[in-house]
């Protein structure tokens, strides 16, 4: 088992990042740059990860792909596509996002609409579309469980996996989020 933390810590170079992770005893890490980084910078981080035996556990999206504002929603979806492509290119274990919110302005907020039948259907439909469009080969796309949006626990996660029915969809089992 590899242990890690969910932050890249403050650093100025890929080498400093990798050394800090190693010093903490981390062997699983979140990727510290996103799809807007240059190919050279991404390669530098990957080289340092390899030198220090760091597994890229996840590439985060952390955007509301169901935002009420159409412009914000499309920007979030484009970012999700680009992040999933990046995660696949670097061989991350997963590319993760929360389901998103359906009832208000806070991207990860708790709203009653988050538990509607429509929210479930939209989540399943969107996830299928994202996977089918990007067609990742090396990474699993996953949804972070949260107590105030789907999935909230193992039963919903299993149902979500069944309904999405894509080999490229994986389970991001964050049990702390299920109980907090």
What are these regions, as identified by a protein language model?
Residues 1-4, 57-66, 101-110:
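N-terminal small/glycine-rich loop or linker at the start of catalytic domains
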Residues 15, 19, 51, 70-171:
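Active-site acidic/histidine proton-transfer and metal-coordination neighborhood
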Residues 2-7, 29-31, 56-61, 95-97, ...:
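Hydrophobic faces of well-ordered beta-strands that scaffold small-molecule active sites
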Residues 3, 20-27:
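A short, Lys/Arg-enriched amphipathic alpha-helix followed by its capping loop at the start of a domain
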Residues 8-23, 54:
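Short, composition-biased local secondary-structure segments
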Residues 7-15, 31-43, 65-71, 103, ...:
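Acidic-and-aromatic substrate-binding clefts and catalytic sites of carbohydrate-active enzymes
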Residues 27-28, 45:
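Accessory recognition modules or surfaces
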Residues 39-53, 58:
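Aromatic-lined substrate-binding rim segments of carbohydrate-active enzymes
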